[in-house]
Amino acid sequence: MNKLITVAIDGPAGAGKSTIAKIIGEKFNLMYINTGSMYRAVTLKALENNISAEEVDKLLVMIDGMDMHFENDELILNGENINSLITMPNISKNVSAYASIREVRERLVNLMRKMALKYSVIMDGRDIGTVVLKDANFKFFLTASPEERADRRYKELMEKGIEVNYNEILQDIIKRDYLDSNREVDPLRKAEDAIEIDTTGIGIMGVVEKISSYMEK
C-alpha cells in the first residue's frame, strides 16, 4: 500500500492558497481540502440560523448536524454544493469571529485529521502546518502584500458578477490579518519547518513551479 502524503499550505486571506493548492492537488493526485471553506460553511449556517459567535453550545449542536465532504474540490454541505454561497462578502466579514472559537476549531480540526488518515491530502488554511497537520510531509507558507491580495479578491468577485469596492476589500483584509494573527486560539503563523513563498508579483503557475520543485526533490 502506498504511503499517504500530506501537504500543508498556510497564509493570510487572499494569498492564493486555494487556487495553488487545487492545482498542486491535481498535479500530484492529492485530495484538496479547503479548510477555510469549512469555517465559512459554519459561518453560513450560523448566520442563516441567527446563532451568534457567543452562543457556543448552539453552534456545536449545529455543527454536529452538518454533513460536510468534498467532491471535485467543492464543499458539499448536507447534500448541497455551497461554494458560491460561502464566497459572498458577508461571509468573509464574519468568518473570523466563528473561526476563532476554540470548540468550533476543535470540532473541525478533528474532521480534517480524519480525512488525512484516509487519503493523501493537500490542505490550506491558517494553522495547517502548526496545528492540524504538524507532521505534514511538506509545509508551505504563502504571503503577499495586502494590496495585492485585495486586488486578487476584487477581480475574483467582479468576475463572478458581485459588485464590490476595492477599498472595502483592502480594509477587510487588513482587519482579518490582524484578527487571524492575534487571536488566542491557533493564530496565523508560519511553522518553523515551513518554506515561505512571497507570491507578490509572481503568477500562479510560478508559485506552483516553486512548490513542485520542492516536492519533486
Swiss-Prot record:
Its EC number is 2.7.4.25. Pfam families: Cytidylate_kin. ATP binds at G11, P12, A13, G14, A15, G16, K17, S18, T19. It catalyses: CMP + ATP = CDP + ADP; dCMP + ATP = dCDP + ADP. GO terms for cellular component: cytosol. Belongs to the cytidylate kinase family. Type 1 subfamily. PANTHER family: CYTIDYLATE KINASE, CYTIDYLATE KINASE/PANTOATE-BETA-ALANINE LIGASE. The keyword NADP does not apply. InterPro entries: Cytidylate_kin (IPR003136), Cytidylate_kinase_dom (IPR011994), P-loop_NTPase (IPR027417). It comes from the Bacteria. Keywords: ATP-binding, Cytoplasm, Kinase, Nucleotide-binding, Transferase. One of its GO terms (biological process) is pyrimidine nucleotide metabolic process. It is found in: Cytoplasm. It is an enzyme of class 2 (transferase). This is Cytidylate kinase. Gene3D superfamilies: P-loop containing nucleotide triphosphate hydrolases (3.40.50.300). GO terms for molecular function: ATP binding; CMP kinase activity; dCMP kinase activity.
